[in-house]
Structure formats: C-alpha cells, structure tokens
Design a protein with these regions (language model features):
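Amphipathic alpha-helical interface segments
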Residues: 187-199, 203-209
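Structured C-terminal helix/loop/strand segments within mature extracytoplasmic catalytic/sensor domains
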Residues: 346-390
Length: 390
C-alpha cells in the first residue's frame, strides 16, 4: 500500500514520536524528591496495589517522575498505570489546558488532579469504535459489512455505484476511498477537510459529497469525518444519540460520570472523532476493558469477539509511531530491555494515549499538551515503564 509522508501536526490527531530532551542517566537510581505512594481506592471501581505487588521496579518510575518534575519532560499532565487488574500508579502534573487560539494551542494553566477532565483529542476515535461494537452486539447494527447507506436514509441521494460499496468496516479502518485532506495540510488552510467539516451546517453531507478516489477497502486515508459518520449511524440504528447511547451501554456500566462529549456547531452533531473530556483514571478503565476482553467488574460490556476484531491488523502502515491499524485502534511492537511488547493503543494530539500491552497485562494512560512538539509518551514507555516490568 502506498502512503504519503505526513508531516504536519493537525488539530484532530497527535503524532507520538520518540524524541525529547535527554533524560538524566542512572537507570535504577531513584533520584531525589519524589516518593511513590500507592493510589487510594476511591470507590470508583478500581482496586489498587503497590508497584512492587505487581512486579514493577519502583525506582525507574520514581526516576521518571523526578524528570517530569525537573521539566526534562514538559507538559505531561498525567501518567496512570494498571497492571494485573490493579491500579498501581497515578500522578498528575500542572500544565496548560487546550486552547485552540492560544500560543502553542495552550489555554489556562491548570493544576491537574484525578478529578480533572482532560481533552482526549483523537483518542476519542477508539471510544467511538467501541460504541459501534456495542451497537452490533446489541443487534442495532447487523454487522461491519453493512453498507453505510442502510443507516443513512437522509443522504441516499448522494449514493452512487462506487459509494454504495462503502461499508461500516471501511469507516472503521479509514479506507472509505473518499477524497479527504486532513494530514498533509495546516489547520489554518482553507482546504483542510476536518476544519471545513466541523464548521459545516451539514457535516455528513459535506463528507458524502466527496468523490471516491480509491476503491473502498484498499487505501488508508486518515478521515475524522468518517468517525462522526459512524456516530450518526449508531444514532439512527439505536434511536439514541451518541451521548445517550454511550452513557447507557459504556460509561454507565463502567461507573464513569465525569465526562463530556463535544458538539459541532452549527450542525449540532456529536463530535465522535475527538475532544471528549474525561479523567485519566476513568480513561484507564476504557483501556482495561479492552485488555480484559470486554469485561469490567464481572460484567461483559463489549463482546470478546469485538475486542479481538477491533484490535487486530487490517491495514499495514509501517509508520514511525504505528505498525498497523485496526478498527480505530493503532497497533505497534515496542522494544525495551531486549524484549518485544505487542500493543494496541488509542492516541490523540498533544500526548493523549491509552497504551494496552496484553502480553504483560498492563495499561498505561498519558495526557498532556505537547501540541507543537513531539510528545514523550513512547520514550517514557521504552525508557522507564516497560523496563520496570519484571
């Protein structure tokens, strides 16, 4: 498969590269200042344990936190770790909220804590994928091979022979074949499709009016509008809007209430391609749900079949930050301590990441505000967190 070289940072997705300032040396030296404390149990459904209880070397984690405090890693707002089903680490750091019109896209300076909701940006896409899976599990949607127009009677006039072949799976894998320019153009330019989509009075019409440029299912074109289309399909099929559906079938069963979807203006449709605000501790529940085959506290929220289908490779990418793509999940092999760690992850602009490592039963969540620089998430994983796992 041929891919363009995408080089510009965009509003709806944050690249995660592995470069940053050089950290201090001394891999197993804890350094001075920070003292690790086991996370408290707050009644939110998480059982907690200490790092040593699950075989994680606390010294390397302490070194990481000292480096964040020393601004070696800047604008990291949270690091949360779940291992073996237990919440074993959470720390929060001050930094800037997202502000689209601010310098470096920074808004207000905030003292983040476990109750502070954070913008997840494009990590929201993986949540939308889960909603599609639930809609299929519940029988609202027949399957991923359904034509999108089976659920879009309002837009049937835009259907033609080529577009009739677009399926739900094509939207989930970013292979709809629709012409779309989102990765190789600045958000300040008039031809940036997601900006035009967001501000359209009818974003779905804007999307489906695009011509087909490749056969559906063959080429990867990152397309946030396609994810909002999935939200509209869930809405039509279930007769609940995305906010209602997610509360009933996902967030409610997870015991999550401190979250907020965003709404596109002037259309009023729910923004499913990005920007849900949620706490990192609750975001980790979502990652653990997929690590645990769709089960949370004994309840099967998403089918095991959907978890496996949505986190396997459909499109090979071979990019620096991802090897392949599933159903709105990225997949990557990490290398640390002469070991290979398979992962799937959700990722958003600025350093938002839900990294799931099935082989070692671990979930790591990051939030941050590195909107014009490379987020350090991958370096932190490979230099500190993965090597700390015994």
């Amino acid at each position: 498969m041929n891919l363009k070289k995408y080089v510009l940072i965009i509003l709806v997705f944050g690249f995660t590269f592995s470069c940053s300032k050089n950290p201090t040396s001394g891999d197993d030296e804890p350094g001075n200042g920070y003292v690790y404390v086991q996370p408290p149990e707050t009644g939110d459904g998480w059982q907690t344990a200490s790092l040593s209880d699950v075989g994680i070397n606390a010294n390397k984690i302490v070194q990481l936190i000292n480096n964040i405090h020393d601004s070696i890693y800047q604008e990291v707002h949270s690091v949360v770790i779940v291992k073996d089903g237990k919440l074993v680490f959470e720390e929060y750091f001050p930094g800037h909220d997202f502000g689209y019109y601010g310098e470096n896209y920074h808004g207000s300076y905030i003292i983040f804590n476990r109750d502070t909701r954070h913008n997840t940006h494009s990590a929201t896409k993986s949540i939308t994928s889960a909603l599609v899976g639930i809609a299929i599990d519940k029988g609202f949607i027949q399957g991923v091979n359904d034509s999108i127009f089976s659920y879009l009677p309002k837009y049937v006039s835009l259907k033609n022979e080529q577009k009739s072949k677009i399926t739900i799976e094509h939207l989930l894998t970013m292979t709809s074949g629709l012409q779309w320019n989102e990765w190789d153009v600045s958000v300040s330019e008039s031809n940036h499709d997601i900006v035009r989509f967001n501000s359209s009075s009818d974003p779905i019409h804007y999307l489906l009016s695009k011509p087909i440029v490749t056969t559906p299912g063959t080429n990867f074109y990152y397309n946030g509008g396609a994810v909002d289309l999935l939200g509209e399909i869930v809405k039509f099929a279930s007769e609940w809007n995305v906010k209602q559906f997610s509360q009933k079938y996902l967030f409610g069963p997870l015991g999550v209430s401190n979250y907020q979807w965003q709404t596109l203006y002037p259309s009023g449709i729910t923004c499913c391609h990005g920007d849900i605000y949620i706490t990192p501790r609750d975001l980790t529940k979502f990652g653990y749900l997929f690590l645990n085959n769709g089960v949370w506290n004994g309840n099967q929220i998403i089918s095991e079949e959907w978890v496996k289908k949505s986190t396997e490779t459909y499109i090979d990418l071979n990019l620096s930050w991802a090897d392949s793509y599933g159903y709105l999940w990225w997949l990557k092999k990490y290398f640390a301590n002469n070991k290979t760690y398979d992962s799937f992850f959700a990722e958003g602009w600025g350093g938002q990441k839900i990294a799931v490592f099935p082989g070692i039963k671990m979930v790591v969540v990051f939030t941050g505000a590195n909107y014009v620089s490379n987020p350090p998430c991958d370096e932190i994983l490979t230099r500190y967190i993965l090597p700390a796992v015994k």
